[in-house]
Regions:
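Alpha-helical structural segments
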Residues: 7-18, 22, 36, 53-73, ...
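Helix-turn-helix
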Residues: 19-54
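Short glycine/proline-centered loop/turn elements that form peptide/ligand docking sites
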Residues: 24-31, 51, 137-138, 144-151, ...
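Short, hydrophobic secondary-structure boundary micro-motifs
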Residues: 28-29, 102-105
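Hydrophobic alpha-helical connector segments
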Residues: 70-103, 110-111
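Amphipathic alpha-helical packing segments from all-alpha helical-bundle domains
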Residues: 109-142, 150-165
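C-terminal peripheral helix-coil segments that are non-catalytic and often amphipathic
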Residues: 131-135, 153, 169-215
């Protein structure tokens, strides 16, 4: 992607984030996005097939960047602290984009839900943690290669989907939302083999501004 394309992408990202905070993407047209972003419709289609796809890709990019920041070098030694810090970063992202996620995760939403995107992103993140050897599988010595693959993939989907469900419940709590309380709850819900830090002080330190979601 060249510099001009990156500038266009940035304008599209700002536009869809603004519009999606107001109403579902099913009510947003490509023409409206293009007009606000100062581009034509054909340029829009070079970046996404539909408004919902554009929003999902923008949010997924932000979440993936946070994951890389906190988990790119995760190992078995630092997994609890790194995973907890990544969880806090995801919570802050969701809190910053609360208007968007409230619309995109609403029970009465018809189509264009953000839940599948979140499930995909977090499942991919968990699989990468497994691939780095940062998690010790229970009874690993008794598992065949096929059983290990089944456990790993099942565990990734299980942890990701459960975390997304918990994020959604937390999003419904009144602002200012309590991250520490969420960590206490999710710590009780996660399986015992999942690395998670019980002392949350360092993870709750103010976020580096460079890692925060951009408007």
């Amino acid at each position: 992607m060249d510099a001009r394309q990156r500038r266009t992408r940035a304008r599209l990202a700002r536009t869809i984030l603004q519009l999606a905070a107001e109403r579902p993407t099913s009510e947003i047209s490509v023409s409206e996005i293009a007009a606000r972003a100062g581009i034509n419709r054909s340029t829009f289609y070079q970046h996404a097939a539909a408004p919902c796809e554009l929003l999902e890709s923008v949010l997924a990019e932000e979440l993936t960047e946070l994951s890389m920041t906190h988990l790119a070098t995760v190992s078995a030694d630092d997994a609890p602290a790194a995973i907890t810090s990544a969880t806090v970063a995801a919570l802050r992202h969701i809190d910053e984009r609360a208007d968007i996620y409230r619309v995109g995760l609403g029970d009465d939403l018809i189509g264009a839900s953000l839940q599948p995107m979140l499930n995909r992103v977090f499942t991919s993140t968990v699989l990468e943690i497994f691939e780095r050897g940062a998690i010790t599988l229970p009874h690993a010595e008794c598992l065949s290669e096929e059983q290990r693959e089944l456990f790993t993939r099942s565990a990734a989907h299980f942890v990701a989907a459960g975390s997304v469900a918990a994020f959604r419940v937390w999003l419904d709590t009144p602002a200012p939302r309590d991250i520490a309380s969420f960590l206490e709850v999710i710590g009780e819900l996660l399986p015992s083999w999942w690395p998670f830090q019980t002392e949350h002080g360092p993870a709750l330190a103010p976020a580096d501004e460079s890692t925060l979601a951009r408007p």
